Amino acid sequence: KPYTTFSDVFSKVKGKIPVFNRKPVIPVFSNRYSKIDFTQTDFDVELIRGRLKTDPDTAFFWSGRTDGIGGMDVAKKIAKNKGGVTLESTIDDTNIVMPEWDFNTPSSVTAWEEASNVYAEQVSGEIRAVVGSELRPGNIWENIELPRLKANPNVTKITTIDPKTGVEKIIFER
């Protein structure tokens, strides 16, 4: 029998609807977005443009490492601790499956460059970036994201954060 109400779902799963302060708790499903899987179809940034928008003052970027410390996971952690999001956490939260980053697969590099570009053009307010002292030549931060952020009239300030020391430095202010 298909589940038709929240009560049906919770009666099967938990035995009752959860209650807080004597009021039923309405469950919120974890992802309201339908899955877009770019490992199964050609990348089209227009399909995800709307999903890559962020609230003002919440966008984080990342690039490079300092003494081996840095990368996506460190940036996600710092962003979360400061109430922000990264491109990757936004992608995860909106049910997008991107191709794995691979220098040897030009379509992978292009997909990530396009997603980064759209993310950077839609952010607003104060932007923070976890940027290490060791950056790969041709990195997306210096070549795509930073120029796009500086050209974005809705960006008021860009602050970098060293992934090892946590030292913050304002690099752009409007």
Go through each PLM region and give its residues.
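Catalytic toxin/effector domains delivered as secreted proteins or via bacterial secretion systems
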Residues: 4-174
